[in-house]
Amino acid sequence: MTVHFIGAGPGAADLITIRGRDLIASCPVCLYAGSLVPEALLAHCPPGAKIVNTAPMSLDAIIDTIAEAHAAGQDVARLHSGDLSIWSAMGEQLRRLRALNIPYDVTPGVPSFAAAAATLGAELTLPGVAQSVILTRTSGRASAMPAGETLENFARTGAVLAIHLSVHVLDEVVQKLVPHYGEDCPVAIVWRASWPDQRVVRATLATLQTSLGAELERTALILVGRSLATEDFDESRLYAGDYDRRYRPLGTHPRFPEGSE
């Protein structure tokens, strides 16, 4: 018996990985975070599967349900939204399972920041503009930010910021970023990226407040950075005609001759 932790993706049911879909179809028990995982994914569960919405459950109750399935020799599909490597609360579940000697594995999912960038049609790391993306959030009731992990510190790098779980303190976010990025820095807020009812707001740090209109909910992602709206960037050397690379050796003495490892 194995517990399969599966990243369900950002929202659209067809953005789950093939592996994730197949694991769901193979498990007689499915636990899903109903507040963020689309119910359409449950159609992949086998007939007669036990399907449990964990949104109203405590960690103890979730682990008890998994342990019950383990005792019955049943595999479990554990669905979380987005990708499990960030803000999934997977770590505490894995720690409990290790203590109980219950085996598990992890299948990654499409993260929300990637879905938001796709919605915008944006490459976040444009040569000469930005080569780093910082995934962060502000302090909330569930988790405080460690000392040093502040918006001001991250903003000093000039990297693209993907700020999660923070649209409810948008005034504070803008106030902290303007001194480092400037009022003309592009911003995009993407609410429920890839869902049928997704919403997108494009603005600058100076105009963001007046561009919002109706209040967006907590699931909105804030993207900040120059690469969101510029045509002034370098072309990658990767595809330059004079660039000697392993799969396209050039000249009489290429850096990577054909057949070399």
Swiss-Prot record:
CDD domains found in the cross-reference section: Precorrin-4_C11-MT
GO molecular function: precorrin-4 C11-methyltransferase activity
Catalytic activity: precorrin-4 + S-adenosyl-L-methionine = precorrin-5 + S-adenosyl-L-homocysteine
Pfam families: TP_methylase (PF00590)
BP GO annotations: cobalamin biosynthetic process; methylation
Source superkingdom: Bacteria
EC numbers: 2.1.1.133
Keywords from the named record: Cobalamin biosynthesis, Methyltransferase, S-adenosyl-L-methionine, Transferase
InterPro entries according to UniProt: 4pyrrol_Mease, 4pyrrol_Methylase_sf, 4pyrrole_Mease_sub1, 4pyrrole_Mease_sub2, Cbl_synth_CobM/CibF, Siro_Cobalamin_biosynth, Uropor_MeTrfase_CS
Functional pathway: Cofactor biosynthesis; adenosylcobalamin biosynthesis; cob(II)yrinate a,c-diamide from precorrin-2 (aerobic route): step 4/10
PANTHER family named in the record: COBALT-PRECORRIN-4 C(11)-METHYLTRANSFERASE, SIROHEME SYNTHASE-RELATED
Protein family according to the UniProt entry: Belongs to the precorrin methyltransferase family.
The protein, known as: Precorrin-4 C(11)-methyltransferase
Species, as recorded: Rhodobacter capsulatus (strain ATCC BAA-309 / NBRC 16581 / SB1003)
